[in-house]
Amino acid sequence: FRTALFIGDSLSQGFALYAPTRDVATVCAYKSTSPNQVLQNFVGQRPDGSRIEMWDDIKVQSPSNIYVLYGTNALISQSDEAFLKYYSDLLDKLRERFAGVPIYVQSITPTTAEQGVKQPPLENGHIRLINNAIAKLAVSKGLYYLDAQEALADADGNLRGDYVGTYDGIHMNPTGYAAWADYILTHTVYSDYNKQFVTEGPYA
């Protein structure tokens, strides 16, 4: 992870807070943000509480691998279509700026069943629907898709109880982040795996 760059919202901020990525990986993740705000270079809050224009922060990095995750905030604040359009534009911008650098687009992580009831856009069935669209989007651009749900969801598709870190049913504890980081390290993404997302799912 020493040459990895994590880009995203407060969920990705956990990689700056917990082992094994803390003080190792570069984390350009900002609280309560969505792709459209990064595209417009809004000021965002870093994990340490400092504030900076988000795209300006991202574009000066020199990673060997990039891991991107957005969606939790966007699904609450805008339509699915708007989120996917802005996400597509941001991925294009990242491809242009970091030409030749592998970009891994991660699935939106699962929430607790209770959180899905409180905020229907974050219900796990809906999240899986959007993840299908994100997977197709990533593959269509020649990027890699990582299904973090495999490491974080229980048999019912909800965030595992032993990974729940806060009252909101979204963010995880150190155990959850360790499992997530291990999944990233142990899953090589290859083209045959990604082909399935082009032809399957409701957004195919």
Describe these PLM feature segments.
Residues L69, Q106-S107:
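Alpha/beta-hydrolase-fold catalytic nucleophile elbow
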Residues A16, G71, S88, D92-A99, ...:
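Sec-exported extracytoplasmic/periplasmic mature domains
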Residues F1-T3, Q61-I66, F98-I103, S140-Y144:
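Loop/turn elements at helix/coil->beta-strand transitions in domains of secreted/extracellular proteins
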Residues V27-Y30, Q106, L146-Q149:
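Conserved beta-strand termini and adjacent loop/short-helix elements that scaffold enzyme active sites
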Residues R2-K85:
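Conserved SGNH/GDSL esterase-like catalytic core that processes O-acyl groups on lipids
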Residues T111-A204:
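Catalytic His-Asp segment of secreted/periplasmic serine-dependent ester chemistry enzymes
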Residues E81-L90, I127-R128:
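Charged helix-capping and loop-helix junction motifs
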